[in-house]
Amino acid sequence: MKIAVLFCFFLLIIFQTDFGKNEEIPRKQRRKIYHRRLRKSSTSHKHRSNRQLGIQQTTVFTPVARLPIVNFDYSMEEKFESFSSFPGVESSYNVLPGKKGHCLVKGITMYNKAVWSPEPCTTCLCSDGRVLCDETMCHPQRCPQTVIPEGECCPVCSATVSYSLLSGIALNDRNEFSGDSSEQREPTNLLHKQLPPPQVGMDRIVRKEALQSEEDEEVKEEDTEQKRETPESRNQGQLYSEGDSRGGDRKQRPGEERRLAHQQQRQGREEEEDEEEEGEEGEEDEEDEEDPVRGDMFRMPSRSPLPAPPRGTLRLPSGCSLSYRTISCINAMLTQIPPLTAPQITSLELTGNSIASIPDEAFNGLPNLERLDLSKNNITSSGIGPKAFKLLKKLMRLNMDGNNLIQIPSQLPSTLEELKVNENNLQAIDEESLSDLNQLVTLELEGNNLSEANVNPLAFKPLKSLAYLRLGKNKFRIIPQGLPGSIEELYLENNQIEEITEICFNHTRKINVIVLRYNKIEENRIAPLAWINQENLESIDLSYNKLYHVPSYLPKSLLHLVLLGNQIERIPGYVFGHMEPGLEYLYLSFNKLADDGMDRVSFYGAYHSLRELFLDHNDLKSIPPGIQEMKALHFLRLNNNKIRNILPEEICNAEEDDDSNLEHLHLENNYIKIREIPSYTFSCIRSYSSIVLKPQNIK
């Protein structure tokens, strides 16, 4: 019996010893374990959020696609309608040659499929010459307080960082948020130092609460130990304390000694925690510096969102408004350029005022202007100071349409990419007028008094990057000489051009579009070698000239040929036979084509490639031969002719079982008796709704 009792007592001692050792694990180690768990949980949460974000971004919605917009807090709130769901549009007579389908928006030419945002709430797309715009759809917020950030239209929670944070940063500091450089500059560091992230403060609070709870538990343990003491030990302690007090050597009790020791340990722990926090912050800063931002995107804040800086006040004249970085004073009845001091402004609109002069100091307070619109004013050449634009080192777009200029302003910034001086009274362009504009891409000089007599052949030589030149509504009789080799699109409509010589396009090997409508060109005044060797020329518009035949010696690379409103009576045989890959769009509306003006070889070389053929408003009495052999044809106009009968095999080939690619067939306003058309005449066309037969003329 005694052996069993001793054995149990021995086991009890071993158990208490092990339990005490487990309780005496250093608190510093426990804190490290606790912080390690916090880090693991935070990283796992980040991974989960990243996975969720990736899933949301790759999800495809049908039938209407939506493009999610990811905010700075990695939430997805705003959604835009996709432009891919817009239906196709039938061709019209207002054809812009070239496959690109450009759009003209506020005087700016947008290429096909270009996407831009004219306002913070709107996104637009150029689709085959049409401008399609969508407004942002804002999802409701479930937070108690919402705010609409500057430059945006959807409300966000007040604790969510907005784009206005970036709007308060100067343009020169924008690179710190992009992927162009892995080094961060001082403004970013200052931004983080001035507003410490809340997550660090939360970690400190959690640590202090954990330490406080540990100390409370220790105090409770001490109280329970004191309560467990026997009365004898209490009496002994009282006698001991009384003896000490009588002797004058007052000593502290064991509980007080423990408390003092705990206080010292607590101070040591706090010092160690401060050192650990400083080390952790240093490690986090190093991790932030080592984490490069890739891609052309804004850098996201590494911690919690930062509040937006206060907006500064800017005094504007009556009738003017401020939108993000644009000051708009359209039709504000201004007589002079207002004195403004706003380095953050990048766009200034002064359209439709009565401004007559531009002094040298007009834009001193707007050094970062990128776009300046001075159209529809009364500005004269003598009223522009010689240094008016000299300080605008970042100016890229200048619009001076609809003024009273007689010459191009001098000392324009070399950063200009677009210059518009349409509808003025320009009398000449000399060799120095466009000097130093080697970055200019677009030049528009329509509606002036320019001709080959007052335009120096060397005037366009400095324009090494020029791709888009508009010289319509002037007085040219020949193609201007000295065009730069970089030119891609040339517009010379509404002039008095009579001929096209062999040397006109000798140095313009990149030219893609030539528009010469509303001139006086005859087919025998087009030199055989004028453009036949052009390898990139795809679109030619010779509408409303004096052509009697489809011109020969057309470029091999031609895809679009627009010949509306001439007096064409015949399409010569094999005129398209040399083209590669082949003509795709041929517009011959409003001419004088008759049945004897076309035969089967007239379209030789284009049977495999022709997609649109316009033969409306002519003198045809029957379906032209070879239509059923045009396998790629999608759009055929034969309306407003004199057609009376449609033979069964003129549209569909009875020997072939495949459906035709025809999507639009116009036969209205002829003399066809619809009831007499055989039922299988249009059997190869997939949908009868694609055929327009009504109304018909009665005679």
From Swiss-Prot:
Signal peptide: 1-20
Species of provenance: Homo sapiens
The protein's role, per its UniProt record: Promotes matrix assembly and cell adhesiveness.
Molecular function terms, GO-annotated: collagen V binding; heparin binding; integrin binding
Record's subunit section: Interacts with numerous extracellular matrix proteins. Interacts with MSL1 and RASSF1.
Annotated LRRNT domain residues: 307-344
Ranges for domain VWFC: 101-158
Compositional bias of kind Acidic residues: 212-224, 270-291
A Pfam family per the record: VWC
Family affiliation: Belongs to the small leucine-rich proteoglycan (SLRP) family. SLRP class I subfamily.
SUPFAM superfamilies assigned: FnI-like domain, RNI-like
Glycosylated residues, chain numbering: 378, 449, 506
Protein name (Swiss-Prot/TrEMBL): Extracellular matrix protein 2
Compositionally biased spans, kind Basic and acidic residues: 176-186, 243-260
Motif (Cell attachment site): 294-296
Classification lineage: Eukaryota, Metazoa, Chordata, Craniata, Vertebrata
Entry-linked SMART domains: LRR_BAC (SM00364), LRR_TYP (SM00369), VWC (SM00214)
Origin: domain of life: Eukaryota
Region Disordered: start-end pairs: 176-316
This protein's encoding gene: ECM2
